[in-house]
Swiss-Prot record:
Renumbered residue ranges of the record's region Alpha-3: 202-293
Region feature Alpha-1, mapped onto this chain: 23-109
UniProt remark on domains: The alpha-1 domain is a structural part of antigen-binding cleft. The alpha-2 domain is a structural part of antigen-binding cleft.
Residues involved in 5-(2-oxoethylideneamino)-6-(D-ribitylamino)uracil binding: R31, S46, K65, R116, Y174, Q175
UniProt-annotated glycosylation sites, renumbered to this chain: N107
Quaternary structure note: Heterotrimer that consists of MR1, B2M and metabolite antigen. Major classes of metabolite ligands presented by MR1 include riboflavin-related antigens, pyrimidines and ribityl lumazines, nucleobase adducts and folate derivatives. Forms reversible covalent Schiff base complexes with microbial pyrimidine-based metabolite, which serves as a molecular switch triggering complete folding, stable association with B2M and translocation of the ternary complex from endoplasmic reticulum to the plasma membrane. Alternatively, forms non-Schiff base complexes with ribityl lumazines.
Record's subcellular location: Cell membrane; Endoplasmic reticulum membrane; Golgi apparatus membrane; Early endosome membrane
UniProt gene name: MR1
Protein name: Major histocompatibility complex class I-related gene protein
Entry membrane topology: Single-pass type I membrane protein
Taxonomy, superkingdom: Eukaryota
Amino acid sequence: MGELMAFLLPLIIVLMVKHSNSRTHSLRYFRLGVSDPIRGVPEFISVGYVDSHPITTYDSVTQQKEPRAPWMAENLAPDHWERYTQLLRGWQQMFKVELKRLQRHYNHSGSHTYQRMIGCELLEDGSTTGFLQYAYDGQDFLIFNKDTLSWLAVDNVAHTIKRAWEANQHELQYQKNWLEEECIAWLKRFLEYGKDTLQRTEPPLVRVNRKETFPGVTTLFCKAHGFYPPEIYMTWMKNGEEIVQEMDYGDILPSGDGTYQTWASFELDPQSSNLYSCHVEHCGVHMVLQVPQESEAIPLVMKAVSGSIVFVIVLTGVGVLVWRRRPREQNGAVYLPTPD
């Protein structure tokens, strides 16, 4: 079971994290039911996240809701875990019944999955969002609209369930209130519990290099790693204009040490005299690496030192770093040599 969760948790993180330059906080709960699971796979799993950090787990093998973050264990009393353990045991049975019903409707046998995701987000400007949806075999099935108190159904089977659920107005209003009020209240509480982890900032280390990916094809890579939170914006520009259509992006992946990594690349025309630059924005700091054709690598290291920002640049060939910060931050940049 431990090996399965070690696989599932990073997978969910990859699905959650998006390229963005705005910092948001989220609380999400994922539930997964499996019919005829293979050996070692529980028939029911529930995982809770704050941002990209797992905070709780439950499965049909242990049948116990348990903390996944030390600050959750330290701040919530034993009766909290027991109360929600009992609730999740009920959800486990409900998922089993609902999955069997769906298989009958679709005339399916064998192994299938039924999933639920519920949660909320607290945006930088103080506004909030909430979401609740179900999936069958990994495909959207029912999606809740809290503003209209209705469900969006994707097929005839889902429409049958939609009509039954929409007949219960009390339950629809309860879900809306939970998404808009209770979920946000829990999120704020968890952010306070884990503030040393969840609200910290670690700036990215950025490197630009070129590589011959195929004979006659040169690719420019811009790679960022060691950053937290995972929200980051990265793009390539040609002569000051973004070249989105030509770019490939890597997923924002956990590095295994509590930080994240990602990359952006595009194929370079070796005969071109254009000026290319990689733009990275993270937590209000904007970095631009301009890459002349003859440069092969331009590593950039950004570290916070005594309240200021220190950039360390190593140039192979000729490169230019253009650095801009938000107007409210007036500290200068200090350039230091590094060994080869």
